[in-house]
Regions:
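Short, conserved active-site entrance elements at the starts or edges of catalytic domains
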Residues: 164, 168-216
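Acyltransferase donor/substrate-recognition loop-hinge adjacent to the catalytic core
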Residues: 111-182
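GNAT-family acyltransferases
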Residues: 163-177, 297-356
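Conserved active-site alpha-helix within GNAT-family acetyltransferase domains
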Residues: 102-117, 144, 269-286
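Conserved catalytic-core motifs of GNAT/GCN5-like acyltransferases
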Residues: 116-124, 284-300
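Active-site rim helix/loop that mediates acceptor-substrate recognition in acyltransferases
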Residues: 27-44, 186-204, 344-356
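Conserved donor-binding loop and adjoining core beta-sheet/short helix segment
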Residues: 17, 28-101, 212-241
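Aromatic (often tryptophan-rich) hydrophobic motifs at membrane interfaces
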Residues: 205-293
């Protein structure tokens, strides 16, 4: 049976081993997301059939990511291992953040299921070359904002950020918080998580970059290359420096997006302002994240039916049937006719209400 280990900072190398080549294009399939949002996702992992299997605990419910194969990984075998684990532990089988292109094989695998694909959690995918150039009339708005920024701050320059720049980054957070006006719990939580992720920059696997004006950062991004998709985990700019956001987006894409097809700027979480902003950059695709809740024939029943035959009537068990049902389970003389022996499946101590 699968054995899960909670994901901690020390597992970043193991996660990158799988996510570095993962072509799912979704932000959840990255080391940065698992670590940045670990307090919310409560992720744990197992390795099986050459695949990474991640289990998350969200709102009191276990949900599994779609398996991520290594070079010789067998996704079908990994899915079978998840099925067996859920059967053995009596855990409802829920596969979440499934890439849309993987849906057909799961629909064939599980004919009875409940599926949804919420708009709020779809990731915004952009072509890396579009973000690096902002060419053509359709990007005239972004170019105008960048030109105004360059005119207002002629000495501004883009710089890669490494672990050696942590003092610079800490000063940026202090400046950013002075201008931060959002009061919602989600906004404050996201900022705290972003600051925590930035502290991992010295580990060497995150890609960092920012805009420098007079030796102070006015904007910064943190990202991760996963299978040719540049996943932007953090993207912040000082509100007082108008045009800093599009300037950062373009410069970051030009510097880090050369070997990438897509740039993933993650979801908008239903925030209207964020949605408007992300749409203005003209995504080529809103990448869906499907949720599969696997069911069986019994799940379709609204109530347990009563079945009547000439010899007997089958009805739902009631409290008054407890003693008779318990006696039946322990009746070796009868159970031997259909090969049932409770001792083979007994787990723990045999109590009076064990079978109920």
């Amino acid at each position: 049976m699968l054995t899960f280990t909670p994901i901690t900072l020390e597992h970043h190398a193991l996660l990158r081993k799988y996510y570095a080549g993962c072509d799912y294009h979704l932000c959840e399939y990255s080391a940065g997301t698992k670590l940045m949002w670990s307090l919310y996702l409560r992720p744990s992992f197992a390795e099986e059939a050459g695949c990474l299997i991640v289990r998350n605990r969200i709102d009191g419910e276990w949900v599994f990511d779609y398996p991520v194969p290594g070079p010789d990984g067998d996704v079908d075998a990994a899915l079978t291992a998840i099925e067996s684990y859920c059967t053995d532990t009596e855990t409802p089988l829920v596969i979440s953040v499934v890439p849309e292109e993987k849906a057909p094989e799961l629909l064939l695998r599980w004919p009875r299921l409940r599926m949804n694909n919420e708009r709020n959690w779809k990731d915004y995918l952009y072509r890396a070359e579009d973000m690096a150039a902002f060419a053509g009339r359709k990007y005239s708005g972004q170019r105008n904002h960048i030109n105004k920024f360059r005119k207002e701050y002629p000495t501004a320059k883009f710089v890669p950020l490494t672990g050696a720049d942590m003092p610079l980054i800490e000063n940026f957070w202090a400046d950013y918080e002075q201008e931060f006006q959002k009061t919602s719990f989600n906004a404050k939580r996201e900022l705290a998580y972003a600051k925590a992720l930035a502290r991992l920059l010295p580990e060497g696997w995150l890609l960092g970059g920012g805009l420098l004006v007079d030796d102070r950062l006015v904007a910064m991004s943190l990202a991760e290359n996963c299978g040719g998709t540049l996943i932007i985990h953090v993207e912040k700019a000082l509100y007082s420096h108008q045009g800093a956001y599009p300037t950062l987006v373009q410069a970051f894409a030009a510097h880090f997006g050369g070997d990438c097809v897509y740039i993933n700027r993650e979801d908008d979480a239903g925030d209207r302002g964020l949605r408007t902003s992300k749409l203005q950059y003209l995504p080529v695709r809103l990448a869906g994240k499907l949720r599969f809740e696997v069911q069986c024939e019994a799940d379709r029943l609204r109530e347990i039916p009563t079945v009547t035959t000439p010899r007997l009537t089958l009805t739902p068990l009631e409290e008054r049937d407890e003693a008779a049902y318990n006696a039946l389970c322990l009746d070796d003389a009868r159970n031997r006719w259909w090969g049932y022996d409770y001792r083979q499946d007994l787990k723990g101590e045999l109590t009076e209400d064990y079978f109920l």
